[in-house]
């Protein structure tokens, strides 16, 4: 099995009805700029408490590795390939420190999100076994790093947890909100092969199944408008350093879809936003609704048969989701979720610094 990645540079799982209902409530209660963020300060407080507790378990040398200045250039230097990373890797932590690091993740992620991270570590070990490179494909090679001081009350701070096929970035602008994108989830193998102890496991299977169901529900001119290419794109476009590369929306606008099809698109977005705590997920959906769901576009490229190379995208003013499954005979997924208005919290930072003057 080959990996063609190249370096170019608390809450439980909620039902869809509960998710949409909480999103509506968040939208209704928010009067501040950035609709839906009114319920988010608790998340920032919880993350600060968990990050501070993790730091407290580190000695001075480890702490200097774990905590970088807010202005450090690595803060926006994310990637999903195997490479050196700032911070401290799981394999270099004590069990107590690992547990505290998981608490940092748990302060942001939902039960589904935590399962997603555990699943990625599981298939990284699978990839190590299948490729015969256990030391290179090491589930312990995922690192946590902090930027800035989580124990302060006024200054922005953030953290990133990252390794092969996984990148989670969070930032807090006190008084303004929490930002959580870009989020990258990958899977290799996307479908664990037979004769392996985890045979049949599909880390991003629910997302892929939802997308295939959606494209198959389209017909005629609507399907023709959705399809932007006969071949998959081969990878996501909005990779590291290229988060805003897709300036033009393509595909079919949701305004042309029927209610069930629009629900299908929202289901895909929910699966990604739903990796975050309910407050964050609801805020993102409220922001989508404020901008107008009809402005979202759904695009597809490549085969419409599972197991063949394919690519899909959901794109609008406040959301960009890309999913590509091309490599390794369409058994190797790259996917990214981005808020184009709030990459690394740039919108919140702008508001924060304007408010400070």
Short names for language-model regions:
Residues 40-60, 65-81, 86-92, 96-110, ...:
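A cross-kingdom marker for long, charged
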Residues 1-14, 25-29:
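N-terminal secretory signal peptides
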Residues 12-18, 28-42:
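N-terminal twin-arginine translocation
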Residues 21-22:
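Sec-dependent N-terminal signal peptides
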């Amino acid at each position: 099995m080959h990996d063609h990645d190249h370096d170019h540079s608390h809450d439980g799982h909620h039902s869809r009805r509960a998710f949409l209902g909480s999103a509506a409530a968040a939208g209704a209660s928010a009067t501040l700029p950035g609709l839906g963020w009114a319920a988010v300060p608790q998340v920032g407080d919880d993350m600060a408490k968990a990050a501070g507790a993790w730091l407290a378990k580190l000695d001075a040398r480890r702490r200097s590795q774990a905590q970088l200045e807010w202005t450090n250039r690595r803060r926006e230097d994310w990637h999903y390939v195997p490479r050196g990373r700032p911070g401290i890797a799981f394999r270099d932590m004590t069990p107590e420190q690992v547990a505290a690091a998981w608490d940092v993740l748990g302060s942001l992620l939902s039960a589904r999100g935590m399962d997603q991270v555990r699943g990625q570590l599981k298939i990284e070990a699978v990839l190590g076994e299948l490729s015969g490179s256990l030391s290179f494909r090491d589930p312990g090679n995922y690192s946590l790093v902090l930027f800035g001081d989580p124990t302060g009350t006024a200054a922005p701070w953030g953290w990133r947890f990252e390794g092969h096929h996984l990148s989670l970035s969070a930032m807090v602008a006190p008084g303004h909100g929490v930002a959580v994108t870009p989020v990258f989830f990958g899977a290799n193998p996307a479908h664990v092969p037979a004769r392996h102890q985890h045979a049949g496991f599909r880390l991003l299977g629910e997302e892929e199944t939802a997308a295939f169901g959606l494209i198959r529900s389209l017909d005629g001119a609507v399907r023709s408008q959705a399809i932007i290419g006969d071949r998959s794109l081969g990878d996501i476009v909005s990779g590291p350093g290229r988060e805003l590369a897709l300036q033009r929306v393509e595909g079919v606008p949701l305004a042309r879809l029927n209610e069930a099809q629009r629900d299908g698109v929202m289901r895909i977005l929910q699966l990604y936003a739903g990796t975050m705590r309910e407050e964050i997920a609801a805020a993102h959906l409220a922001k989508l609704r404020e901008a107008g769901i009809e402005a979202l576009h759904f695009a597809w490229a490549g085969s419409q048969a599972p197991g063949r190379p394919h690519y899909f995208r959901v794109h609008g003013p406040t959301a960009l989701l890309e999913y590509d499954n091309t490599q390794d005979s369409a058994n190797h997924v790259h996917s990214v979720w981005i808020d184009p208005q709030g990459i690394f919290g740039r919108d919140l930072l702008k508001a924060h610094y304007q408010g400070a003057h």
